[in-house]
Amino acid sequence: MLAKATLAIVLSAASLPVLAAQCEATIESNDAMQYNLKEMVVDKSCKQFTVHLKHVGKMAKVAMGHNWVLTKEADKQGVATDGMNAGLAQDYVKAGDTRVIAHTKVIGGGESDSVTFDVSKLTPGEAYAYFCSFPGHWAMMKGTLKLSN
């Protein structure tokens, strides 16, 4: 009898939905200079957050490369401008730029890359932006990242 009751409790608990935080996101880029997501939400209970970037287009990275760069909203334009001068060899991100919270490498069609960053780098209430720093892309390929409760 006790075994049946224990089994019933275990099976009931196993059927409950898992409420763990989602500490990763996948974003796609394409040959039309677009991301498929305009917003990402990071649960503040996550210690780290991973972004998986996939280029679903066909063009090479020298012609239509994309990356994913995270900064404060106020720093976006300056980081993008400085990134253009850094060049493809630096993934269009100025070396040592402390305004950059995280970034992937520049990828071409059919490629993917991931980046993981510490959520402790994010401040509640701060406005964050992500964008592609490939020259000419940042004005179109952008979105917001929010820290949630």
From Swiss-Prot:
GO MF annotation: an example: electron transfer activity
Its protein name is Azurin
Q: Which Pfam families match?
A: Copper-bind (PF00127)
Q: Which cysteines are joined by disulfide bonds?
A: 23-46
- One GO location term (cellular component): periplasmic space
- Which cellular compartments is it found in? Periplasm
Main localization category: periplasm
Report the source organism.
Achromobacter denitrificans
Give the CDD domains listed for this entry: Azurin (cd13922)
Alphabetical list of NCBIfam families matching this protein: azurin
In the UniProt record, the signal sequence range is: 1-20
